[in-house]
Regions:
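Cationic-aromatic interfacial patches
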Residues: 7-87
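Low-complexity, Gly/Ser/Thr/Pro-rich intrinsically disordered linker/tail segments
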Residues: 12, 21, 193-208, 216-217, ...
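Catalytic-site beta-strand/loop segments enriched in glycine and acidic/polar residues
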Residues: 52, 56-72, 175-216
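Domain-scale selection of a single, long terminal region
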Residues: 2-6
Length: 293
């Protein structure tokens, strides 16, 4: 076939997944692995866990992605296989698990990363609570208040997207300030309640920042350990790891205490928001990409 290159098709079938971790694969290899995973694991929740675990050890790097070359406010690319931060890890895992090919993965990734799938820094889901969670209601549903019941805690969050875009991305956008009250599960109740979560569910870590603001500061996924215990699989410095919720909380508290003893300001872990992976997911189409002005 004219123009075709041998060995570069992402739709070629493979008999077994590559032994190398996902973060060491080239896009062609990743595409074949995505197709293999979809064919050999029909259960979406298990497929999410398998793909996420295929990235254990992936090096952590903050602020990885942008809109380049679609937009040139920076030169950050629109996907990353070799590194991740917490959000990139979750987005790539969900997008791969929902796809059957590299092409579909790339489309799905943009559908998840941007409001209505419209690519642009102003439509990217920057804020976890009011952007990502709200825009991806077709994928996950916040069950934090339901899970915690009378023990639920909450915080007020105010988002000024226009100021954020202007100061961080040199982008002008007329977006009104938004305020919302967010429920979460206090950290003291998380280990007892985590058993109600299911594999593939979405985890938001809620922290009190040194400046007094409360917000989601980290995200990851629920997976099942060998004994059925709920584990937290996430990307954090230095690399993607899997651990129990108790271990994560203990590490966070030890880090906070270390900074306190050193006289340094620190954020404080308050608890977690949990979002249930929806059943019978129907991926909405992207909105038309508007012509740039």
């Amino acid at each position: 076939m004219p123009g075709a290159s041998a060995g570069t098709s992402t739709s070629e079938s493979i008999d077994a997944p590559p032994e190398k971790p996902l973060y060491q694969m080239r896009p062609v290899e990743a595409g074949r692995y995505i197709a293999w995973a979809h064919e050999h694991e029909p259960d979406l929740r298990k497929r999410i866990a398998a793909i996420a675990r295929k990235n254990i050890g992936q090096p952590y790097q903050l602020n990885l992605l942008g809109e380049f070359p679609y937009q040139v406010h920076d030169e950050l690319p629109m996907f990353s296989l070799d590194h991740s931060d917490c959000t990139v890890f979750v987005e790539h895992t969900y997008a791969m698990a929902l796809s059957t090919s590299w092409d579909e993965f790339f489309w799905m990734l943009q559908r998840i990363r941007y409001r209505d799938g419209i690519i642009g820094v102003a439509t990217r889901n920057h804020y976890t609570e009011l952007d990502w969670n709200a825009a991806n209601g077709w994928l996950v549903t916040d069950v934090s208040a339901q899970l915690a019941g009378p023990d639920a805690a909450s915080y007020m969050m105010t988002v000024d997207r226009a100021t954020f875009l202007k100061t961080r991305h040199r982008t002008e956008a007329a977006i009104p300030v938004e305020t919302s009250r967010q429920a979460y599960v206090p950290k003291a109740r998380v280990v007892a309640l985590a058993g109600q979560m299911q594999e593939g569910d979405y985890v938001n870590v809620v922290s009190l920042l040194a400046d007094g603001k409360t917000m989601v500061t980290h995200v990851g996924l629920v997976v099942l350990g060998p004994d059925g215990e709920r584990h937290f699989l996430h990307s954090s410095d230095p690399a993607v790891r899997e651990e129990t919720f108790a271990a994560f909380i203990a590490r966070a508290e030890a880090r906070e205490e270390g900074k306190r003893l050193a006289g340094k300001k620190s954020s404080t872990l308050l608890g977690f928001k949990f979002l249930r992976l929806n059943d019978n997911i129907v991926v909405p189409p992207m909105a038309p990409q508007p012509r740039p002005s």
